[in-house]
């Protein structure tokens, strides 16, 4: 069977988890990524292929992509950039470091992952 492989970030809870389970139920091969190792087992128990991916860490992004491509035979049909977090508080109360961490996850990490995925998808016209 030639399942279409999908990588989804931020699958521990909420929308990411629902998307992962929903696409899996529709026959997609879902690589559900989570930031914390402790969340992997629950997703695997639900029938998903799960892996650790910390969008703040370039080495984690690289390792996750290597793992997904190895397990999918170098094929990836879609990337769903769901992993992110909100930094609550008034802007004047937030430190530069708090905002930097949020941008590392929500912007820079997402951009880096997307830049790694696009050539794979384009090469296969998927």
Segments and roles (model prediction):
Residues 4, 74-76, 122-126:
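Active-site loop of short-chain dehydrogenase/reductase
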Residues 12-13:
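Conserved glycine-rich cofactor-binding loop
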Residues 46-59:
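Rossmann-fold cofactor-recognition segment
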Residues 50, 94, 102-103:
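A hydrophobic alpha-helix adjacent to the NAD(P)-binding/active-site core of NAD(P)-dependent oxidoreductases
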Residues 82-87:
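Conserved NAD(P)H cofactor-binding loop of Rossmann-fold oxidoreductase domains
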Residues 90-91, 98-100:
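Substrate-binding pocket helix/loop in short-chain dehydrogenase/reductase
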Residues 114-115:
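A short, exposed helix-loop element centered on a Lys and neighboring polar residues
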């Amino acid at each position: 069977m030639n399942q279409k492989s999908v990588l989804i970030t931020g699958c521990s809870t909420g929308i990411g988890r629902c998307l992962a389970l929903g696409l899996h139920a529709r026959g997609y091969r879902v690589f559900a990524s989570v930031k914390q190792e402790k969340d992997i087992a629950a997703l695997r128990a639900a029938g998903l292929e799960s892996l650790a991916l910390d969008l703040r860490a370039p080495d984690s992004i690289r390792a996750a992509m290597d793992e997904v491509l190895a397990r999918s035979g170098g094929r990836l049909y879609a990337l769903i950039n769901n992993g992110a977090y909100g930094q609550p508080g008034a802007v004047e109360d937030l430190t530069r470091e708090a905002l930097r961490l949020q941008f590392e996850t929500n912007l820079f990490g997402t951009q880096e992952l997307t830049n790694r995925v696009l050539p794979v998808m384009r090469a296969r016209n998927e």
